[in-house]
């Protein structure tokens, strides 16, 4: 069974220590986040994860896009929509993705393989991640241009489609769209579906959508979105697994969250194994990709790494 992560990893920044780093720091060119990306990549590869991330160490999932997309800004830690939304003139995340690929490939050449349209067999790579348009809009205060949130969602989808294309060109093995707000009930699911379809349109690599939270009531609708992988949490929200009974997957794989990201407690091998077996009984191992419930940014490094190792040790047996 393939393994992946949802995205974020504990961001451990490093002060400049070498002479060249100190000189760079004097001139304001030292990037403290590169060491955090490197650590996140090394830990994920060390744990045996197949499709890793760059760790999303730079900023919150909303702020990193709100600071870069035309028509959006962040003021006093509040994301805002202040004008007509347009794509960023340059990629927001491609440089970190390319650096992560370089680091991973330096550890194992497998992570440098050419991305494929399907995730079959033995696949290694780095995923590119965008925060979904519905989540960005419903996390922001609208102060200009838009009277309807739905219109902002669609414009953001077109802007994020450009970013997804940047990530694909940068070597992403998967493009993932994070849409946690869909599970809250405040988002128009039909608008969200249209927006995700706009982002995914024309991409030559697999597209994944992550929706955390309880999704049993909307599960069937989420499986109609134009993505190849639908990712949910099953460890922290056991009720979600009931939605897998007699489900029509519409040809999708399920990202099967099987370790809880909300606690530092490290699951036993038996816990993870029993949960994955329940998923296999319902939809089959061939339709599953094992991953944590959600991002691991708030966990300690020791907990995050240990959880990933337990998960991989179980998943590789299926």
Each model region followed by its residue ranges:
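Domain-level signal for soluble alpha/beta catalytic cores
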Residues: 1-318
């Amino acid at each position: 069974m393939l393994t992946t992560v949802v995205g974020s990893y504990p961001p451990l920044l490093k002060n400049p220590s070498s002479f060249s780093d100190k000189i760079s720091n004097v001139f304001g060119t030292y990037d403290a986040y590169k060491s955090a990306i490197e650590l996140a990549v090394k830990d994920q590869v060390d744990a045996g994860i197949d499709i890793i991330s760059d760790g999303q160490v730079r900023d919150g999932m909303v702020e990193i896009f709100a600071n870069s997309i035309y028509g959006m800004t962040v003021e006093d830690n509040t994301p805002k929509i202040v004008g007509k939304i347009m794509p960023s003139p340059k990629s927001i995340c491609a440089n970190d993705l390319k650096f992560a690929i370089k680091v991973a490939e330096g550890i194992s050449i497998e992570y440098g393989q050419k991305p494929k349209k399907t995730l079959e067999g033995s696949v290694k790579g780095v995923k590119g991640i965008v925060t979904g348009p519905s989540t960005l809009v419903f996390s922001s205060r609208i102060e200009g241009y838009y009277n309807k949130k739905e219109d902002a969602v669609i414009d953001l989808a077109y802007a994020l489609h450009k970013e997804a294309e940047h990530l694909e060109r940068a070597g992403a093995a998967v493009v993932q769209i994070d849409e946690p707000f869909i599970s809250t009930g405040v988002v128009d699911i039909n608008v969200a579906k249209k927006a995700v379809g706009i982002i995914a349109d024309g991409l030559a690599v697999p597209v994944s959508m992550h929706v955390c939270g309880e999704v049993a009531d909307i599960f069937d609708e989420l499986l109609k979105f134009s993505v190849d992988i639908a990712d949910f949490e099953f460890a922290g929200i056991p009720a979600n697994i009931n939605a897998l009974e007699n489900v029509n997957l519409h040809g999708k794989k399920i990202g099967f969250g099987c370790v809880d990201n909300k606690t530092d407690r490290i699951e036993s091998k038996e816990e993870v194994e029993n949960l994955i077996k329940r998923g296999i009984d319902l939809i089959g191992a061939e339709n599953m990709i094992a991953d944590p419930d959600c991002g691991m940014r708030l966990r300690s490094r020791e907990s995050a790494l240990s959880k990933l190792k337990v998960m991989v040790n179980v998943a590789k047996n299926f």
